Amino acid sequence: MQDTFSSPEHFTVLLREAVGGLALKENGIYIDGTFGRGGHSRFILSQLSKKGQLIAIDRDPQAIQVAQNIQDSRFRIVHDSFSAIPDICEKLGLTGKIDGILLDLGVSSPQLDNAERGFSFMKDGPLDMRMDTTQGLSATEWLRLVSEQDLAWVLKTFGEERFAKRIAQAIVGYNKSAVQSGAEPLNRTLQLAELIAQSVPFKDKYKHPATRSFQAIRIFINSELDELEKVLNGALNVLAPQGRLSIISFHSLEDRMVKHFIRKQSKGDDLPKGLPLREEQIQHNQKLKPVGKAIMPTEQEMAANVRSRSAVLRIAERI
């Protein structure tokens, strides 16, 4: 059953678990770093008093349009990437005062379902893939410029694609031939998906052959892992003591980064062995503590929303 805080076009993944992980204070100040279609934001607002505040951020212009329909004095929407959270907080005088940050790192259903955005290999549309369509190179433009070696690296690094070299050779070769013959280079999603499928010698019956390549290109185009690294490091200065991080990731690269970051910050900086330090001195060096174990969607949620099946939620608290 769809949650009442989700929109008709988008199921909000791990809604109650992610918001619950923030341990909301009714007068607290919170950040939803990935507004999307507002499921998490609306739920947070429903739990806050009149003195509470919520700052929502998204770099998708369509998400900003949705957010502008929320008429609530406690709510502020910012068109930016979540990596800008430290700068946004500094401008608002909120550095060190944030009680919780929620990040839902997935591509939203409206983004996937809108063929014009170019995220999906299941629908034909222009090969774009930008979260913010007002900035940067589209996938079409980048694929026209990239070398075979660099493309193979992207596919291998961000998609963990075992046939990265074959696929890169096919894509770059196609575009070179198109330029030489005066034809159009790759510029449609199904066109790229079919070319990738033809390049892969073995098919996985459970996964489309273009899945990993589309993921890799999208991650690179949007600098997704760089953005995540920036916000993780910046969150330490933004959060108030006992402030919470609640982060939902959707693939192993993101989850690995979040997991390792929390683990590193919960241990503190490396100290030379043999130093005569008391336990409280060692703990003073720690910046975060994990809250519980990783949380996955229930069978019921996965049945209602198949796209939630790869979601992993991790929660940490500022010390």
From Swiss-Prot:
Uppermost EC category: transferase
One GO CC term, this protein: cytoplasm
Keyword terms of this UniProt record: Cytoplasm, Methyltransferase, rRNA processing, S-adenosyl-L-methionine, Transferase
GO molecular function annotation: rRNA (cytosine-N4-)-methyltransferase activity
Subcellular location field: Cytoplasm
Listed EC numbers: 2.1.1.199
Catalytic activity: cytidine(1402) in 16S rRNA + S-adenosyl-L-methionine = N(4)-methylcytidine(1402) in 16S rRNA + S-adenosyl-L-homocysteine + H(+)
One Pfam family it belongs to: Methyltransf_5
Role this protein plays: Specifically methylates the N4 position of cytidine in position 1402 (C1402) of 16S rRNA.
Protein name: Ribosomal RNA small subunit methyltransferase H
Natural source organism: Histophilus somni (strain 129Pt)
UniProt gene name: rsmH
